[in-house]
């Protein structure tokens, strides 16, 4: 990544270039951490493409919720997936799962579905297909930046509002 390049060029050079170190990085990292990467890949892909509840994840993956739950717990312990509950609630049936790591979230959301195009060296076409969805992807990134900023302001004594935790509600 380079701050001298546009977002488009950075994405093309890193994620849409088969010669880039990041092109296969999430899959390679996962293979180092788990014994059965296929089901883990399927779960991460399901979450990256919109499944957020355990029933939705298991439906997309084609496995029972019990099996998926065990794999999701491992992904949580690896810091790849996170479980969120609505702000102010303890354990909740409203819990949702999301990809915690921005690189994993981007890669699993956009690279696999464009893999054939990328493999043929058509980074421009792949980017053209990705670009309309970048603002959706950046929504969660922006939320996280805002949370980090608020915590920094609070800890430095510069936040006009007192709080002890931050979260989302749905």
Predicted regions and their residues:
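A cross-kingdom feature that marks ATP-driven nucleic-acid transaction machinery
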Residues: 87, 95-170
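Interdomain hinge/linker elements that couple catalytic modules in large macromolecular machines
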Residues: 1-105, 109
């Amino acid at each position: 990544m380079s701050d001298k390049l546009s977002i488009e060029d950075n994405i093309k050079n890193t994620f849409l270039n088969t010669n880039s170190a990041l092109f296969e990085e999430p899959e390679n990292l996962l293979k180092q951490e788990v014994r059965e990467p296929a089901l883990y890949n399927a779960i991460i892909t399901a979450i990256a493409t919109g499944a957020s509840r355990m029933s939705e994840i298991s439906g997309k993956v084609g496995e029972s919720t019990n099996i998926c739950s065990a794999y999701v717990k491992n992904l949580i312990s690896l810091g790849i997936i996170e479980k969120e509950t609505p702000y102010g609630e303890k354990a909740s049936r409203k819990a949702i799962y999301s990809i915690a790591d921005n690189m994993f979230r981007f890669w699993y959301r956009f690279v696999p579905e464009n893999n054939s195009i990328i493999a043929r060296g058509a980074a421009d076409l792949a980017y053209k297909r990705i670009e309309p969805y970048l603002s959706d992807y950046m929504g969660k990134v922006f939320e996280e930046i805002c949370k980090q900023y608020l915590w920094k302001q609070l800890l430095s004594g510069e936040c006009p509002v007192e709080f002890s935790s931050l979260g989302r509600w749905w």
